[in-house]
Amino acid sequence: MNPTHHVPDAQASLAKKAVPVLLIFFVFSLIIDNSFKLVSVAIAKDLGISTTTVSWQATLAGLVIGIGAVVYASLADSISIRSLLVAGIGFITAGSVLGFVFQHSFPLVLLSRIIQTAGLASAETLYVIYVAKHLPKNEQKRFLGYSTSSYSLSLVIGSLTGGFVSTYLNWAALFLIPLLSIALLPLILKYMPKEESKKSRVDIVGLLLIAAIATSVMLYITDFYWIYILVLAASVALFLLYISKSKHSFIDIAFFKNKRFVSVLAVAFIIYSVQLGYIFLFPFLLEKVYGLHLDTISLLLIPGYVTAVVVGASSGTISKYLSNKQSVSIAMIMIAASLILPVLLYGGPVIVYVISMMLFSGSFAFMYAPLLDSCVSALPSSQSGTVIGFYNLTLNVATSIGITYTAAMIESVSFKTILSALSLITLLALCVYGLLIGKTKEPA
């Protein structure tokens, strides 16, 4: 894929007609995924399962999205985006129907979420690839900006959808909403261009090893069986051996010889495990401590997401006055403060948690671009596609593991202790950043 090629005006005009359709699918997919993250409380109650068990419907979904992004990006070089979108909607439909029919069996609900998410994963990745392949280079930033706004919008709508559907209908009704994506099929077939196929390949082995690494970590956090540590060690060893020997791996061993790249990945992994850890904790905490229903909890999340939108939109201007190191350090300090606040005022008014989530979400929005830029700038620009792909995969694995360890803590320690633990993990990320990256010279 060559995103820098010239696109004729007539072709670009036709290509732009497909953008609204892709954005609708993009927003719709994220709404569904975010809705299911919020209703873990309702699923656990309805099916009589533990917090740790129910967390798997969110953690495995995150893992599938991360791996799915790499798979769809690889397939887009050999299969038309049009065909991949149709396949994505097929997965969404199959998973949603299966989940609704077998809503009383958690193993089948889990399988349904995996199938459904395999389809949802197509939306974001294929939109970015479509913009790079079919729209003029000088307009690509504008269209990519639409995806950022769409993501923020989906967080708001997703939390409201999950909260109100689970409160006034039933959480299982969320499996019916994705079926509306079928209505997009005629528009996709009408406006999406037919592309020529060319040979490409997906690194199945590499992705399976990444999945094995992430899953073994999550299983160990859940059950603490030593066998999972052995599986983890074996998976890591096999992955490193594979990428050092294979000529077709999706990432080369040379990337891991770059200390700055590895350091940024380590920091990103630690800090982003905290992100969905707190978001997963939020509804459980407010439901058990304050007796709030999910519809009310979803409303309390909105100020945080709106703050993220505003900060994200302003981060470009702010970055002109701060270096990446300064921006990331400030963001991590604010994240730690947002988690320490409810610890100090535990049991106080609910507004404390609203303010906490506003600081938390805004800080992550502020940190995203400079931390990503630190990662991308560690290697030549010609390798930026691979860097971004593996960075995003790392974030998805980290958030999945964050949900897992938070769910495990919910069942064994107090909410106050969990908040303290999350703040300490954030401070650990800040220390690692200062030791490994903070003292090095930033690439020009």
Stretches with model-predicted labels:
Residues 167-179, 221-225, 408-427:
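A membrane-interface helix-boundary motif in multi-pass transporters
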Residues 27, 56-63, 90, 114, ...:
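Transmembrane alpha-helical cores of Major Facilitator Superfamily
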Residues 15-32, 36-37, 51, 82, ...:
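12-transmembrane solute porter fold
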Residues 59-74, 124, 128, 302-314:
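Central cavity-lining transmembrane alpha-helices of secondary-active solute carriers
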Residues 39-68, 106:
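Extracellular/periplasmic helix-loop-helix junction of adjacent transmembrane segments
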Residues 171-266:
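Hydrophobic transmembrane-helix bundles of small-molecule transporters
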Residues 69-199, 364, 393:
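Helix-loop-helix hairpins in multi-pass membrane proteins, especially solute transporters
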